[in-house]
């Protein structure tokens, strides 16, 4: 196995009236999964800038950050290489946009769900940890 690669990503969790916005996308195994919008930091970009950009690209909503929410650190294997990933999550509110994803080839669907319903749809440990945090907001 080759040396470990490091990746930094950021994402946003839009919470409105007790519901969160989830996106459906394809994971590395080719399966459709529900998750929160996120993506890699571009060179020179802060985590906050990346989160706002990714949420707008993947949901069509321009959002403002309300607070730092969660940090996930985990490792996984991709094409025989170990990747150490660091993801910063921000709590956001909608401030404009049309709700039409700018990356329709990546996003299959979007839906608003209550925290309880979202918990039943989400598979990733970090996403479920975010739901647990939001229950106490």
Functional labels for PLM-detected ranges:
Residues 41-67, 72-129:
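Unchanged
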Residues 1-36:
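N-terminal strand-loop-strand
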Residues 17, 95, 136:
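Residue-level marker of positions within ordered structural domains that often coincide
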């Amino acid at each position: 196995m080759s040396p470990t690669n490091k990746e930094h990503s950021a994402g946003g969790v839009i919470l409105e009236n007790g519901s969160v916005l989830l996106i459906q996308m394809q994971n590395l195994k080719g399966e459709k999964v529900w998750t929160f919008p996120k993506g890699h930091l571009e060179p020179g970009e802060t985590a906050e800038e990346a989160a706002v950009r990714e949420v707008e690209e993947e949901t069509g909503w321009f959002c403002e950050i309300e607070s730092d929410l969660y940090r996930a650190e985990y490792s996984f294997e991709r094409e025989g290489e170990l990747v150490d990933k660091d993801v910063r999550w921000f709590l956001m509110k909608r401030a404009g946009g049309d709700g039409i994803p700018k990356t329709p080839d990546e996003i299959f669907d979007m839906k608003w769900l209550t925290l309880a319903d979202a918990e039943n749809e989400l598979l990733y440990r970090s996403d479920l940890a975010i739901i647990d945090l939001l229950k106490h907001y």
